[in-house]
């Protein structure tokens, strides 16, 4: 398997939950808004023997040419977005699910971003967000899934997709947040999404205030760090600036 981050940039985010572009190499780096955190937003693409898999879809921003950012990032790697076969959604917060679909700048219609792919989505996560979110843009972006023939609704707490993607609901960050292990040819890539978003959090007993249950997330990270070392996982960190993937050295 090959894995590539599809970075959409660094962002400062505070209690308003608005993602503001932030240059982490600028002299103002230590002086971001009070109470904010600095994150990278980076979906991943994994190329296996038979599939091109997306892990989450980013913010859903369009570039100046009206091209979806995640499409541009894929094409920069030589990957035709229409060739993506699977899209796995960890949860449906804006920074992970915004690229599910996009508003066409000319037709002003919502288009599914990867029409030839299967979208794997937790049904309970979808229902919860559609019922409780007050963000009309997000609701439009994810709402198209209801009538899209390519959706595979996941209804179990854990399972296996095509003997390749092993998933499990963890909670922690959101009630139906799920993680995934891609397993092929004795190789394991682990995607912990927002329960395991950054390398540094794996190494400490960090409890995040932005989690629904920060203690539960911390306990998951400790468990995965130990198991990942034993089984030589490659970790994919969605929000890590500078360290998108990491494989634990068994000597540490």
Language model regions located:
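Zn-dependent metallo-beta-lactamase
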Residues: 1-50, 223, 250
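Active-site metal-binding motif and surrounding structural segment of the metallo-beta-lactamase
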Residues: 66-120
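Histidine-centered divalent metal-coordination motifs
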Residues: 88-96, 173, 177, 239
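Core dinuclear metal-dependent hydrolase active-site scaffold
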Residues: 2-8, 43-47, 53, 156-185
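Short, P/G- and charge-enriched loop/turn segments at secondary-structure junctions
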Residues: 29-34, 107-108, 167-168
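Residue-level marker for buried hydrophobic side chains located in beta-strands
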Residues: 53-55, 88, 119, 189-191
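Metallo-beta-lactamase
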Residues: 59, 75, 113-169, 216-233, ...
